[in-house]
Amino acid sequence: MNRSDLLENPRTQTESGFLLIHKPVGMTSSDLVVTVRKKLGFKKVGHTGTLDRAASGLMILPIGSCTSFSSVFLEKEKSYEAWVKPGESTDSGDKEGEILESLSKEQTETWFQEHQEKLRNLFEQVPTWETQEAPEVSALKVNGRRRSDLFREGVALVPVVRKIKIYRYELGKFSPESISFQIRVSAGTYIRKIVMDISDRIGFPLRLEKLVRTSIGKLNLNQADSYESLLDGKIKIHPPETILDFPTVEVPDTEVRNVLNGRKIKLEWIPVNEFLLVSPEEEILAWCKKEEHGIHELDYKYLRVFPKN
């Protein structure tokens, strides 16, 4: 479906599904949402978690009624490829921030020759980390305001410490010019803060030079459309059943209307936790959740019903 088809097609305003887009460096997540609205004509577009302006990579954008599923992806594991610049540090931990310290090439190489084993050991210990203090320059809100804005104004911020988990980690290039690694982490983990913390522990300036998000849950960057494809209007709308991990329960034709009217029906089986009710044509009718300790055919609740247009 190209751009002209989308703009001329009356389904554009009611289409539901997901867009997988490779966000470029220099654009905020909100900028990408605005671009999708303008270029493709969708009124209802959301996103499933921010990606820093200085980073690129996979963004999942729900459209239409699928914006109801935005929160589902917030707790998914995420994978990244990171490149670190030795010899320079910023207040944000990436190249977008204000420079705090910058060493010459000669100073960096001299320090690296003397301390590289200690630095390598710190990088290799990353998989053992279990907590992380959120960076002061972040999109997290304090009384409705971004921490980064308050930090820039000189407001003292209360540390926000989170539990994190490193599922996979591989250290790659390791030289005075660049350090690289691949990592898969729990939701809410800041890769640039990992670099900032290593820098603080060893007393040597480091910052992220490049960061690419390569996956969110089961979805990979190689499935995403390029930003150029978005600008050309040549972008794929992924149906929800190919994106969501929820089990499905088929509803007979005789009960479809009851579900769409928000009336619970008896189910032959109820999956663990959350699930979708679908029609015989595999159209999503409702998003449901099993009641805690539920054992009967009605022991579930509707999280969202998707009425037909």
From Swiss-Prot:
Its EC number is 5.4.99.25. Gene3D superfamilies: Pseudouridine synthase. PANTHER family: PSEUDOURIDYLATE SYNTHASE TRUB1, TRNA-PSEUDOURIDINE SYNTHASE. It comes from Leptospira interrogans serogroup Icterohaemorrhagiae serovar Lai (strain 56601). Belongs to the pseudouridine synthase TruB family. Type 1 subfamily. NCBIfam families: TruB. InterPro entries: PsdUridine_synth_cat_dom_sf, PsdUridine_synth_N, tRNA_psdUridine_synth_TruB. This is tRNA pseudouridine synthase B. It is an enzyme of class 5 (isomerase).
